[in-house]
Amino acid sequence: MVSEKIKQEVEKLRKEIEYHNYRYYVLAQPVISDEEYDKLMKRLMELEEKYPELKTPDSPTQRVGGQLIEGFETVEHSEPMLSLDNTYNENEIRNFHERIRKVVRDVQYVAELKIDGVSIALRYENGLLVRAITRGDGLRGDDVTANVKTVKSIPLRLPEPLTIEVRGEIFMPVQYFEEFNRQREEEGLLPFANPRNATAGTLHLLDPSQVAQRKLDSFMYYIVKPQQYDLKTQWDALKFLEKLHFKVNPHSKLLSSIEEVIDYWKEWTEKRKKLEYWIDGVVVKVNDFEQQNELGWTAKSPRWAIAFKFPAQQVRTKVLNITFQVGRTGTITPVAEFEPVELEGSIVKRASLHNFDYIKENDIRVGDYVFIEKAGGIIPQISYVLKELRDGDEIETVPPEKCPECGGPVGKESGEYVAYKCLNPHCPAKLKRHIEVFVSRQAMDIQGLGPKIISKIVDAGLVKDIADLYYLNIFDLAQISGLGPKMISNILSEIEKSKQNPIEKLLVGLGIPGVGEKIAKVLAKKYKSMEELSKADIKELSEIEGIGEDIAKNIVEYFNSPKTKEILEKLRKAGVNLESAETTTSNILDGLTFCVTGTLENFSREEIKRFIESLGGHFTDNLTKKTDYLLVGTNPGSKLEKAKKFGVKVLNEQEFLEMLEKKGVELKESWKKPKPKDTLF
């Protein structure tokens, strides 16, 4: 039994430590020495170790990192995290202003520094941080809560018991980025190209204690549904975030004219190098929320905001060679190889030249001196050829007569398309690129199969098409250098797991030209199976919203190919799902809301969601008092304790399946009922 005195001491220590965290990491105004701070933390850790029942998720001790993470759950955003339109010049920012003025008058702007980091969404319930989600594709992101808890400028508990979602940027300060890269080089590892890449990589580490060592920082700038907190402007929102103890960039400014915005941009174009973090521009937002709503959004970005980016830096280098890469469809892309040069914080050695017409139009030759820049601050490209420095030894580049990968014949597409392609249907480079697409997250999401391993598997003759992946075994992969038993086991497990993916993911992986995630979902919704889709004609397909005649033609040609029929048959025999998710088959779970924590034996998170919905139930990622059931697998998270606190009924997987059987649901024979000993209660 813990005495009341100990409980009070623990609570007092937590409040003191969080107060000093706020003074140091947010305000940069410490009032105690590091030694005094360390004593407070040490005492709290001692008490929590002695009385583990006093440890809570919002304790400052949880920032140092705890148990290893098994992986990252994909979570839907409460509202999309849209990107911003951007511009690089004053005329376009004035045009932006004129578009605004056509809709609203008396406009004010808030100008904020555009931090070069990773966008994050933070969800708080009753003042406690419950979830941190990366931007991902804007609709869904990765749950990186355990890692974000190590960022000391992000409060684990708000000073008010609010339920709120805020968004901002997590970044790696320049000082720590440079130290981190030096350390990587000393260890023989490749340095990160920029702080943004380093931050993204850090947030996806499986060990939170390693994340804590990398000293990430944050700035928050956005509140979801701000009117719920009686906020009328973006400037009000920034002040409210400060009140909630979030770190807000001190250089944000309220401006009354577009000329003031331009002056602000010019000021920071010069001053940005003096900052302790990287910025790549200025974000300009209409201040008034009512005006924002009146202006509205496009599908991709708000009309009331724009990123006013800094002009790209340019450096001079020499073209040492022009090499060729072969893509998934056989397209041959020329690539310029440079003398290594530093550009905006990274070493640039190469840049795509897109196609051979581009080389001809810009007269780019081996031996030329060129200026290069980063398009959008990211992608290296040649901006100017210094033809006046030529000495006559420069070499013009002509399209290859044979494929650089397989030696097969090369041809140019008819019509306006300017690419040269390898015509060998068995070119290994095509297969390698296709498999890279097939295993990608947007497609079959087979983790562990990176480009290097794929290349080795293809070169060893173990796979001749994407379907052959499902016939690999432990003896096949044991032939591949660099693959140990654990990695082989993980790869085979990932391949097996992917068999149950919905067919929209398989459709993306098949690589049909024009069929991405959005169209794949439309097709999976309309057609019950891959077989039914394969029988559709061009007229029928082209009448589907979002699918024009060109894509319809691509789909029909793909499914009419004998090779496609062979691949689909091999996939079917391997047990890969070729049928669409069932629509609601009954209403036995009608009105019931389910949430899941931990790893289930028979279902992935997406599969259990679809299964529950097919029975009329509702699936949610967020456990609340209104949730009816929490379904618990192995290694459950904090939702289990929350369910007990809220009085939500908890089921293990066996109990869930038995409940369905009693309600008359016919279970698949392949589903194993987990043994009672595997449950935690």
Curated annotation (Swiss-Prot):
A GO MF label: DNA binding
Pfam families: BRCT, DNA_ligase_aden, DNA_ligase_OB, DNA_ligase_ZBD, HHH_2, HHH_5, Nlig-Ia
GO cellular component labels: cytosol
Entry EC no(s): 6.5.1.2
Database matches in Gene3D superfamilies: 5' to 3' exonuclease, C-terminal subdomain, 6.20.10.30, BRCT domain, DNA ligase/mRNA capping enzyme, Helix hairpin bin, Nucleic acid-binding proteins
Keyword DNA repair listed: yes
Active site: 114
GO biological process, one term: DNA replication
Listed cofactors: Mg(2+); Mn(2+)
Catalyzed reaction equations: NAD(+) + (deoxyribonucleotide)n-3'-hydroxyl + 5'-phospho-(deoxyribonucleotide)m = (deoxyribonucleotide)n+m + AMP + beta-nicotinamide D-nucleotide
Binding site for Zn(2+): 403, 406, 422, 427
Keywords: DNA damage, DNA repair, DNA replication, Ligase, Magnesium, Manganese, Metal-binding, NAD, Zinc
InterPro entries, sorted: BRCT_dom, BRCT_dom_sf, DisA/LigA_HHH, DNA_ligase, DNA_ligase_AS, DNA_ligase_CS, DNAligase_adenylation, DNAligase_N
Domain spans labelled BRCT: 584-673
Residues annotated for NAD(+) binding in this entry: 34-38, 83-84, 112, 135, 169, 285, 309
Enzyme class: ligase
Recorded family membership: Belongs to the NAD-dependent DNA ligase family. LigA subfamily.
Entry function: DNA ligase that catalyzes the formation of phosphodiester linkages between 5'-phosphoryl and 3'-hydroxyl groups in double-stranded DNA using NAD as a coenzyme and as the energy source for the reaction. It is essential for DNA replication and repair of damaged DNA.
Xref: PANTHER family: CHROMOSOME TRANSMISSION FIDELITY FACTOR 18, DNA LIGASE
Protein name in UniProt: DNA ligase
